[in-house]
Amino acid sequence: MWRVGHLLLLMSIVFRITEEKSLGDAGSLEDSMFIQEQKLVEDDDLNKVESFLGFMKEDFLRKLNLSGVPQEHRKVQPPQFMIELYNRYASDKNSIPRSDVIRSFVVQDVIYSIRQGNKTQHRLLFNVSIPNHEEITSVQLRLFTLWHRHKPACDDLFTSINVYDVEYEQNAKILHLLDGRDVRESINTWEAFDVTGAVRIWHESRRGAGEIQVEVQHSCDSFDISLSLEDNSSAVVIVFSDDLGNRKEESMRKVKEMLVREQQQVGNQAPVSNRHRRRKRKAKNNYCRRTSLKVNFKDIGWDKWIVAPPEYDAYECKGVCYFPLTDDVSPSRHAVIQTLVNLSNPKKANMACCVPTKLDPIAVMYQEKGVITVRHLYEEMKVAKCGCR
């Protein structure tokens, strides 16, 4: 009898050890499956990022109407006006530009400068190239005024500046007055003159290059304009234009394709019942949200032609649309119904997708063939809000 009891005790101990080992193996197997699943999710996230960067590069060039990446051999110093313009658009979301494309063309050559008494004439050569699919809205000639304080002061500081378009007809030079003004403030500053009419003629005639004559009349010999070709105070033509192509419609089509692609990626993840419990436990940490996705132009080899910004946060939408859908993810009615169906029968409907619901614009300053351009890219460049759809 004692032997039978002892045997039963040994058998119960062995059974408990075996049972605990089996449970431990089952737990290890579940943990292993969970780790493997997490690795697949991380690999999928990496593929999404690479896919996004590829899409972003193509879309970026298309928005700028560039057939390829500009091959710039040297950095160009942007004119001060272009720097200020970019900073205003980049820092103030409510600052709406009058044109979506602004280009600067620095004076190519000073053909001559002649001083006769109290009058000085400067003949300037500009080479302005604007794509045919853009419409010129306005053009400024910006001149930096120089007051020579070391020279004797005049009783009456008076200076007038007139700007002319130079036209040649049968070897005859004809001057057409474009703009002019009197300058009385004795400080070094930028003065802007309207030369829209002349540059439009250059553009429509497809010759691109044109000459502008600047005449300075002063009451004393203490005033001039900066014509240095070595720094960013040189004379510069600023062209404001609108892109008349179907860029905006095409951009929205691309965004819709991106949304569909994200939906397909989520939809391809078949809802498996044994994953559903683990996902539910992690719902609070993996809920639909906007996360950072920084694009550094140096990292992708674009810093030679992108002047500013050096990087920007495009953001992305990550996570899953778990029940209940809260107001902060602004769910559509269809997403709410789809989530309820998925909750009751995961095989019947996938979960709603976490996608961008609002996109914001950015301003970009870049150089192409030595020309500095500021472009305001509308509504398609970075995620502002995410939601369940």
From Swiss-Prot:
Belongs to the TGF-beta family. SUPFAM superfamilies: Cystine-knot cytokines. Residues 263-284 are annotated as: Disordered. It comes from Danio rerio. Residues 274-284 have a biased composition (Basic residues). A reversible disulfide bond can be formed between the two subunits in the homodimer; this has no effect on gdf2 activity. This is Growth/differentiation factor 2. Glycans are attached at residues 65, 118, 127, 232, 342. Homodimer; disulfide-linked. Pfam families: TGF_beta (PF00019), TGFb_propeptide (PF00688). Residues 1-20 form the signal peptide. InterPro entries: Cystine-knot_cytokine, TGF-b_C, TGF-b_propeptide, TGF-beta-rel, TGFb_CS. GO terms for molecular function: cytokine activity; growth factor activity. The keyword Secreted applies. Residues 263-272 have a biased composition (Polar residues). Keywords: Angiogenesis, Cleavage on pair of basic residues, Cytokine, Disulfide bond, Glycoprotein, Growth factor, Secreted, Signal. GO terms for cellular component: extracellular space. Coiled coil: none annotated. Residues 21-280 form a propeptide. GO terms for biological process: angiogenesis; BMP signaling pathway. It is found in: Secreted. Potent circulating inhibitor of angiogenesis. Signals through the type I activin receptor ACVRL1 but not other Alks. Signaling through SMAD1 in endothelial cells requires TGF-beta coreceptor endoglin/eng.
